[in-house]
Structures are given as C-alpha cells and as structure tokens.
A protein has these predicted regions:
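Periplasmic/extracellular loop-to-transmembrane helix junction in inner-membrane transport proteins
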Residues: 2-13, 17, 39-83, 103-104, ...
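Transmembrane-helix boundary motif in ABC transporter permease subunits
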Residues: 7, 82-114, 283-292
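N-terminal signal-anchor/first transmembrane alpha helix
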Residues: 9-35
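Interhelical loop and adjacent transmembrane-helix boundary motif
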Residues: 139, 225-273
Length: 310
C-alpha cells in the first residue's frame, strides 16, 4: 500500500514539475524575445534619433543611408484598419446569420467552410490576391491602372481574418443565456431587434476579443501582404498606391542586410512589438473596466433587492 502511495506521490510531483517547466518555458521565451528586441533595437533608435527613425525616407543601402519608417508605419495602419473593417463587417454578419437566421442544417457546413479558411497557408491567399484581386482592381476599379496597393492587401487580409471573427463572435453570442433572446421576444421585439439590441451588446466583450485577435493577425501578416502590396516604401496617399508595410520591410531585408540596416530592421520589430503590447494592454484594461462595472451593477441590484424585501 505504501509503495502504491509513494508511486502516486512521485507521479504527481513529476507532473507538477512538467507543468511548471512548460509555464516557465513560455515566460522565458517571451522574456528572451523582449530582451533581444530592446537590447538590439533601442540603442540604434537612440543613435540615429527619433526624428530620423520616424522620417519618410527609407534607403538603408544608399551612399547617404536613411532609416525612416514613417511611410511604412502609416501603410501598416491603413492596411490593418481597412482589412479589419472588411473582416469585421462580413464576419460579424456571418456570425449573426449562423446564430439565429440560418437554417440549422446549413450552420455546420458553413461554419466548417469558414474554419477551413484558417488552415489555408498565407502564400495561397497571396497567390489568390495576386492572380484574381490585383488584376480585378487594376482593370475595373483603380483610376491609375495599378492593382497592387492598400486596397488589394486589405481585401486579402480581410478574407484571412474572417475565421477568427466568425468563430469568436459566434461563440460569444452562443455563450449569452438564451433567456435574454426569449425575454426580448416576449416583450414584443422582432428577431432582428432582439439580436442587435440585446444579444450583441451582451456578447460585445467576446466580440471585441475576436477583433483584437484579428488586428494582431492583420498587422503581423507578411507573406500574403508582400505578394499584393507592391512594396514601394512611399507615404500612402491613395488606396491604389503601391506601398510597403513594416512586416514586409523586415522580411524583404532580413536575409540581405547587415550592420546598421539590419539593426534598423530589428528596431522596426521593436515598433511592431510595442504596438502589439499596447493593443493587448488596452483590451485587458477595457475588459477589466467592463467586469468591474458589471460587478458594481450586480451589487447594486442585490442591495436594492434586499432593501425591497426589508
């Protein structure tokens, strides 16, 4: 009996050690990446100055090198914002359709097809954009006759983030108690009113989480963007202009640049890292603030109920 107890005790300690090691590995990996980026990128930014680093001219290999990333930063924000606008618009309405307005026998096939998009490699999306979207924009939409640019990149990224928006939004709405929807109908609301005025506000925290994930996916995407964005490091002034994003710039120069140009790419990575960190931190603060407000409302209701009983 003692031997069995001893074996179980040893196994529990081994499993606890394994779980702790996995958790520590994640922390160490994040800390290592953070230290590498900051130790390599911040000295370069301090060396050339914020004014030059956030300038508009990027020419790291010229006789008079310049390391300005402002045009690529603006292009990244434009592409990300437009792609999220497209993806959230289509994805949210798709989730709403699957939630209450789609025949039950169609829900599973449509959701499986949407989820299948998440398993397609980025390069396939890039090929689709390069052979279908870019020629279509060039021939039928662009006034300048250029298909590469912000709009084509945003359309490709909008398609890529659809599975995230649809899945997270649908799960968030399904997590809301069905009594909310039934109660709204009982009070005279239509299905559309109950969905948009009751269910969506109740699920907004989960939907916002999906939007944050989509933004992270969009701003970090590289391969598909390289194939359709045009890759000209110019300040964007039009949706149909060839531009270059931060991730595309890093990927294009990572294997060729050494010395200061390579340090400039690492410094660009610092900007991306800080942007992602700020995005996640902002979402966490918003979510915590909402949780605190909900807790305060719940306490007020309980106090009101007690006062009414007394």
């Amino acid at each position: 009996m003692k031997s069995i107890y001893g074996f179980v005790h040893v196994r529990e300690k081994l499993m606890r050690g394994l779980f702790l090691a996995c958790a520590l590995f994640s922390v160490v990996a994040l800390a290592t990446i953070t230290v590498f980026l900051l130790a390599s990128g911040l000295p370069f930014i301090a060396e050339i100055g914020l004014g030059e680093f956030f300038g508009t001219r990027w020419a790291p290999l010229s006789d008079t090198p310049a390391y300005g990333i402002l045009s690529m930063l603006v292009a990244s924000l434009y592409v990300t914002a437009l792609s999220v606008l497209i993806g959230v618009g289509i994805g949210l309405f798709t989730a709403i359709c699957l939630y209450k307005f789609c025949p039950r026998w169609l829900v599973s096939p449509i959701r499986q097809m949407v989820n299948l998009l998440s398993g397609i490699p980025s390069v396939i999306f890039g090929l689709f954009g390069m052979t279908v979207i870019v020629p279509f924009i060039r021939d039928y939409i662009s006034p300048s006759g250029v298909g590469y640019g912000i709009l084509s990149s945003a359309l490709v990224l909008g398609i890529m983030i659809l599975p995230t928006i649809v899945s997270v939004s649908l799960d968030a709405m399904q997590a809301v108690p069905g009594s909310y929807f039934e109660g709204a109908l009982a009070l005279g609301s239509t299905r559309e009113q109950a969905t948009f005025r009751v269910m969506l506000p109740a699920a907004k925290s989960g939907i916002l989480a999906g939007v944050v994930l989509a933004v992270g996916r969009a701003i970090g995407e590289t391969m598909a963007v390289i194939m359709v964005v045009g890759n000209s490091p110019e300040m964007p002034v039009s949706l149909f202009q060839s531009v270059r994003t931060l991730t595309a710039n890093i990927a294009l120069g990572a294997t060729e640049m050494k010395g200061d140009p390579e340090r400039a790419l690492i410094a660009t990575g610092v900007v991306l890292f800080v942007f992602t960190l700020l995005l996640n931190t902002s979402f966490s603060l918003l979510k915590r603030d909402k949780t605190e407000k909900d807790d305060r409302k719940s306490r007020r209701k309980k106090e009101s109920a007690k006062e009414a009983q007394s």
